[in-house]
């Protein structure tokens, strides 16, 4: 599920058409592989009409594009955490999550809820009880390392939990660092340029997931020109911010030199189909493919697919 920017939202005004074009292209790449629904408000809908099938557009009002962060985690057993405000004011983040909650209630989206604070982007799991977050989760909830692990195990029924030092301090999300591509295969950015940090990350992953196969993937970082999306780290160059479904992996690419090697390593380590998604137009804003995607399955998915078709 994608959430279109509103034509009335001043924050996205400068990038509005770029985001819309990206979402259209991304949706077209999903069609035929997985189901997709795009949430649009009525004044924004004309920008999508005729460019994607009409029956994937659902007119509603969800207040932000970064759907990963304020929705639910784990499509198999959805849990809605309390959205933190790393990227906006507390008032804004409450409004954004409220718009989602009202939307989810309208369509009777089944989910558990918790008061624990977490952005969905700081939650990477294999859908089968192995979970990765960063120390930001500890700070936001004023928990020690062992308390944080226990809370996540209790709240999610998780078996194994890793809590990483984040590789950037703004959002401190784990989904720019790691990706579970198969039941037992975990990909992690190659941090060998910062050996001490690499050791810290690898030690925590190996200790937390003793039986998992852990594979490093090349990563390059870009910095935004001054004045462009100030306060956010660019997500350009991070191929692991991928959307992983039952049969497919939508991998962001950036027209950068390391893209092909990263894609090759991902392909070699999964039986799933790899679908590259050019993300150059949106990654400077601080997120890419996974950040822009909310994943639902089963009855929850059927309700939304049907609602879009019925409109």
Give the role of each language-model region:
Residues 1-311:
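Histidine/cysteine-enriched polar flanking segments
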């Amino acid at each position: 599920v994608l959430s279109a920017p509103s034509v009335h939202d001043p924050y996205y005004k400068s990038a509005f058409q770029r985001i819309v074009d990206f979402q259209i292209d991304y949706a077209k790449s999903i069609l035929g592989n997985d189901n997709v629904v795009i949430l649009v408000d009525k004044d924004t809908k004309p920008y999508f009409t005729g460019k994607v099938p009409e029956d994937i557009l659902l007119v509603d009002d969800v207040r932000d594009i970064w759907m990963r962060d304020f929705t639910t985690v784990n499509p198999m057993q959805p849990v809605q955490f309390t959205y933190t405000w790393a990227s906006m004011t507390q008032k804004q983040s409450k409004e954004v999550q409220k718009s989602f909650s009202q939307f989810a209630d309208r369509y009777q989206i089944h989910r558990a809820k918790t008061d624990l604070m977490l952005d969905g982007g700081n939650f990477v799991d294999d859908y089968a009880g192995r979970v990765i977050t960063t120390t930001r989760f500890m700070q936001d909830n004023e928990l020690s390392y062992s308390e944080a692990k226990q809370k996540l195990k209790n709240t999610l029924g998780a078996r194994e939990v890793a809590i990483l030092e984040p590789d950037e301090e703004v959002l401190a999300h784990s989904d720019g660092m790691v990706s579970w591509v198969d039941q037992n295969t975990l990909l992690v950015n190659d941090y060998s340029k910062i050996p001490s940090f690499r050791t810290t990350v690898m030690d925590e992953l190996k200790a937390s997931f003793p039986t998992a196969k852990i594979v490093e993937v090349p990563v390059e970082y870009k910095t935004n020109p001054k004045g462009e999306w100030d306060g956010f780290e660019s997500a350009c160059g991070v191929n692991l911010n991928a959307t992983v479904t039952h049969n497919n992996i939508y991998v962001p690419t950036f027209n950068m030199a390391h893209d092909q090697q990263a894609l090759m390593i991902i392909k070699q380590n999964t039986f799933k189909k790899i679908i590259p998604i050019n993300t150059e137009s949106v990654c400077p804003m601080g997120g890419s493919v996974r950040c822009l995607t909310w994943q639902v399955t089963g009855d929850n998915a059927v309700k939304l697919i049907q609602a879009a078709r019925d409109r």
